Amino acid sequence: MARLRIAQAVVALLTTVAAVGQDGPTMGWSSWNTFGVNISESIIKGQADAMVSKGLKDVGFDHINIDDGYFGGRDKDDGHLLIHATRFPNGLKPVADYIHEKGLKAGIYSDAGRNTCGSMFNGDVTGKGVGFYGHDQQDADFFFKDCGFDFIKVDFCGGSYYHNEDHLVLDEQERYTAIAQAIKNTGRTDVRMNACRWAYPGTWIDNAAFSWRTTGDINSSWESVKGIIAENLYLSAYCSKGHYNDMDMLEVGRSLTSEEDKTHFGMWCIMNSPLLIGCDLRNIKQETLTLLKKKELIALNQDSLYQQAYVAGLVNGCFLLVKDLEELNGTKRAFAVYNPNDVQKTVQVNLADLDLGGLVKMYNAFITRNKKEATGTFEVTVPAHGVCIYVAEAETRLERTRYEAETGYISTYQEIKNNQAEKTGIYEAADFCSCGYKAGWLGCSEANALEWRNVYSKDGGEYNLTIGYICGESRNITVSVNGEKVKTLSCNSGGWQKVGTKTLTIQLQQGQNTIRLSNATNWMPDIDYINVVSTNPSGIDPIHNSQFIIHNEDDAVYDLSGRKVTTPRKGINIINGRKVLK
């Protein structure tokens, strides 16, 4: 019966895609990458036509977003927005209506300050004085009540003092919060706002926007795509239902190689970025269209758990990223083996590092007929600038033991202001750390702490917590579990490029736990990782004599390599997802 159930599960795995949520990252098309400010009513309508006729709507792409370039200044008497008479001679509402008639959603653009980016960098003078600043409610009413738009991208060129000619010094939190309130005042609760500030704004953004840009503008080059991926590797803790790290509009189908296009789209999918196509849909290449319509990849992006894949390992220069699908802490997961290097790499993937035990059935999300089975480890060769993405179903789910610092949450984290002056923690590249990153500049306030909010324990109980830290002088870490302070540790690893460890015993409750590292008064050490391992008393549960008997073939017993065995062997075994000692 066990084999039959596994076979049935594999059939389901290979013939269905992940459950699609209603609040997943925005999917659609945006005008900026191809057209810049040189847009028109006919161009926008043509993209809506193509989205439907080419089958993109059928796989989930449902937004047509008008970016910068439609402005015509403001009325001198009452300040209402004027629309470019040549590019949009009939105004915006007929265009939005046309998009809606196609069964699609319509998006628009503005700036949090006075002037748009196009007015500054593209010579589009009609974009001066047209931003939200001074007109928050007036413009929100026009966009969302009068025209019926469903999405808005709000730039910050007019709000940043080093960009705008007025030298306005506007506060990002104040401006985006005010605009969000103006949208709320329209009575619309379904509008998605994207905050385009070109860096992670701060954790306050959750209360203002549906998504937010995390980097500078993308361009159609591998270095740009690679850099954006690198900056988002450590942002998984800031992604949740209705709140997404925006890796910028897609450059797929423009000038990247076929392999780079696959990596670009695949990583945007598994990392839960919004998916906004940037090429001209009217002339899209068949190869590009086939990639963008790959349902198995889209399902990863729109999965109902709303997770961004997190870094689980760095092997031979390649990153392993993983996330749950359909069920938290279940046996179905998606993982990527990402090769940012300029040469092909062969990687030995230890499935236990992905918390997958026993026989693992998987398929390549790019080539669904490429089905694999593996126990313990499997080998994959990844092209230069490439990625292999798999959807996997395991016989058993192992408890996660390694939590990298770059998967933790810092409540003060932001990338806009000088973090040292603000005393806010950040994530930094560090080649001496286990996955190439660390969390640093932590402490000096209770809020500036590092915490993992998703430490799962199947049964609860006693665990060994090991902290990998970096500190060239004596500093303290206060360890808290589920809001209760456990212990304060004095740490000194003997150098700022040397990882030291401290181990203590903690108690976890059954289910989800939060582990927090803090120092309310002074700087604390930089953090590489934590290990969380069950201990009873040595990190392993003892097997009682009655457990030596396997009563039926459904008992889940494995050796440490993940191979299923009929009876526990001498030493450490895995029984029903827990390490036990015979």
Task: Kindly give the residue locations of the regions a language model identified.
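Residue-level detector of functionally pivotal "anchor" positions at catalytic/ligand-binding pockets or at interdomain
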Residues: 399-403, 533-561
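Aromatic-lined carbohydrate-binding/catalytic grooves of carbohydrate-active enzymes
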Residues: 43, 47, 51-165
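Carbohydrate-binding surface patches
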Residues: 268-271, 276-278, 314-356, 385, ...
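Aromatic-lined carbohydrate-recognition surfaces of secreted/lumenal glycan-active proteins
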Residues: 104-122, 183-202
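C-terminal tail/sorting-segment detector
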Residues: 572-582
